[in-house]
């Protein structure tokens, strides 16, 4: 594993309106809002049962508000793959299944505790028991749990209290190259994600790494020449804000500051 302990990065959220607003309010300084990105240990098949760094991985992502899964779609003989070949759909499915398995274990343990209390005459947990069974049915069918399926606020509150991994918003980051095999992997990943009601953003990390030393204007010109509209990090930040349901607003502050 390249990553053992979580690495935390704080990035500014891109907002094209800031410069224009700064001129309007005559602010001397702008403080953009930020987003915390956490790079955690990779996941392998069997992580829900402790394989690899599974227990550590699951513990780390339980603390996150949303998940971004980087999926390899490119070929490179110098970079090995744990399964010996590149298959984007398989890799995405492994992650999703491990999250489902972990939640099945969480819910079944909770179900056992509630069953004992119900048998002793405690009827207050009857609704929670019904919700657990409904969630288990969803997970056993291979689907993630969607809170918008539930209209009752109390039901949503109870489900959130389970701290399930499959309730968290998730999207895929497809790390691609310009080969035909990479394009096929990207297409396959898009089809899989569509079926799971999850989004995919396309990035070329190697290309951006190669031009990282260029100044901002040269970097922008190069990306445009390659048909890339914006840097990978910007795409990731924007998608993260979107799936978290965050709103971005700006307000003038004292001492000539403008805070986003």
Residue ranges and their predicted role:
Residues 60-66, 70-197:
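Conserved C-terminal guanine-recognition region of P-loop GTPase G domains, centered on the G4
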Residues 1-6:
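Short beta-strand-centered segment that lines the nucleotide-binding/catalytic pocket of NTP-utilizing
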Residues 15-18, 31-37, 51-65, 89-92, ...:
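Amphipathic alpha-helical transducer elements in NTP-driven molecular machines
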Residues 249-254:
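Conserved small/polar residues in nucleotide/adenosyl-binding loops
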């Amino acid at each position: 594993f390249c990553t053992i302990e979580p690495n935390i990065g704080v990035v500014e959220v891109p907002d094209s309106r800031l410069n224009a607003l700064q001129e309007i309010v005559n602010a001397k300084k702008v403080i953009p809002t930020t987003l915390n990105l956490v790079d955690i240990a990779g996941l392998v098949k069997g992580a829900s049962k402790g394989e690899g760094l599974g227990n550590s991985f699951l513990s780390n992502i339980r603390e996150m508000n949303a998940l971004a899964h980087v999926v390899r779609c490119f070929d490179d003989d110098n970079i090995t793959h744990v399964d010996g070949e590149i298959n984007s759909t398989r890799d995405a499915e492994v992650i999703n299944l491990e999250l489902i398995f972990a939640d099945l274990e969480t819910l079944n343990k909770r179900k056992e505790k509630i069953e004992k209390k119900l048998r002793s005459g405690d009827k207050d947990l009857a609704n929670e028991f019904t919700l657990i069974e409904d969630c288990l049915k969803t997970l056993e069918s291979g689907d993630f749990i969607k809170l918008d399926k539930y209209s009752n606020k109390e039901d949503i509150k109870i489900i959130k209290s389970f701290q399930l991994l499959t309730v968290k918003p998730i999207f895929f980051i497809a790390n691609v190259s310009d080969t035909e095999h990479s394009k096929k992997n990207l297409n396959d990943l898009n089809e899989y994600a569509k079926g799971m009601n999850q989004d995919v953003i396309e990035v070329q990390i190697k290309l951006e790494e190669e031009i990282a030393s260029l100044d901002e204007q040269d970097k922008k010109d190069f990306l445009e020449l390659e048909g890339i509209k914006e840097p990978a990090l910007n795409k990731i930040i924007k998608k993260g804000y979107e799936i978290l349901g965050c709103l971005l607003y700006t307000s003038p502050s004292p001492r000539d500051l403008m805070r986003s």
